[in-house]
């Protein structure tokens, strides 16, 4: 789970509802003060939300990019149905295509997905690459997650079947290590209340369906490479969801731009947002 430094967007961003042909999605829409060099759509990961990218918005807008971070269906402030079928991978991919259509205007969109969001973004590109100028896979591997993470997802799925979301949150916090607990917010308060509020709005059906996808995702790297879309693979220096070496190999197979963010683990977007934003802006500028 990414832990954003705050849930309050910067002055350059507005919290809005993005209207698409597949419904409305909660977004943070950050815009540059001057000319727009490109538009990027950011897709969050498992248990995440648009706020996971909040520390990237200001530096990317300052670099000239409009950045739209989205809550997928069933994530935080985008409601979703209780039917797991609504969160099948093709459905989520179509959502991304609809979001891209709503923000792209006359140009194409830089697409970024973090963790699970990277695999959803990949599925969208495989369905239709035309709306996209580039793809960034941020801490998102080629296939299923590590064995340890599969076990954690299985435990979470079982807990959601037996308890309500508040009880599940309390159990997660009770088992967390000190390093996994929420850090103080930028204003000195604990971020735990905001993280808990986000968790309570997640759809259990979404978490169950996408958790299953993370445990069973096939390797589609060859298919993605065949699309010919400029691709960037970004990770931290270590990652317990997909080993860094696995992402190195994926980048080679994709002939992708490869960036390792110093001091970061599974969430470079929150662990080291300055270097992450710099890497993204450089890649997007090269493929404007």
Segments from the language model and where they lie:
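Alpha/beta-hydrolase fold catalytic core
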Residues: 1-40, 62-65, 201, 285-288
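Gly/Ala-rich beta-loop-alpha elbow adjacent to hydrolase catalytic centers
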Residues: 113, 117, 121
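Flexible "cap/lid" loop of the alpha/beta hydrolase fold
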Residues: 122, 126, 132-163
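Conserved alpha/beta-hydrolase catalytic His-Asp/Glu region
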Residues: 145-151, 165-225
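Conserved loop-alpha-helix segment in the C-terminal half of the alpha/beta-hydrolase fold
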Residues: 226-264, 270
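Post-His helix in hydrolase/transferase enzymes
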Residues: 270-282
């Amino acid at each position: 789970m990414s832990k954003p430094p705050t849930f309050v967007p910067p002055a350059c961003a507005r919290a809005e509802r993005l209207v698409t042909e597949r419904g409305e999605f909660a977004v943070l829409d950050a815009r540059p003060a001057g000319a727009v060099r490109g538009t990027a759509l950011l897709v969050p990961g498992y248990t995440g939300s648009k706020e996971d990218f909040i520390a990237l918005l200001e530096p990317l807008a300052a670099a000239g990019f409009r950045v739209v971070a989205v809550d997928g269906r069933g994530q935080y402030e985008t409601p979703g149905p209780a039917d797991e079928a609504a969160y099948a991978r093709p459905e989520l991919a179509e959502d991304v295509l609809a979001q891209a259509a709503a923000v792209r205007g006359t140009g194409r969109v830089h697409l970024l997905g973090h963790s699970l969001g990277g695999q959803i973004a990949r599925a969208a590109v495989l369905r239709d690459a035309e709306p996209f100028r580039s793809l960034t896979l941020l801490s998102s591997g080629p296939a299923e997650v590590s064995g340890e993470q599969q076990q954690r997802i299985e435990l979470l799925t079982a807990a959601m079947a037996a308890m309500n979301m508040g009880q599940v949150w309390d159990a997660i916090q009770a088992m967390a290590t000190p390093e996994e607990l929420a850090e103080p917010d930028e204003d000195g308060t604990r971020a735990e209340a905001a993280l808990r509020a986000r968790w309570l709005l997640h759809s259990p059906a979404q978490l169950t369906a996408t958790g299953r996808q993370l445990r069973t995702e096939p390797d589609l790297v060859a298919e993605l490479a065949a699309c010919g879309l400029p691709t960037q693979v970004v990770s931290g220096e270590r990652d317990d969801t997909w080993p860094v070496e696995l992402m190195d190999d994926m980048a080679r197979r994709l002939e992708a731009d490869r960036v390792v963010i110093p001091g970061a683990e599974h969430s470079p977007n929150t662990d080291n947002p300055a270097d992450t934003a710099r890497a993204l802006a450089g890649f997007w500028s090269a493929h404007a």
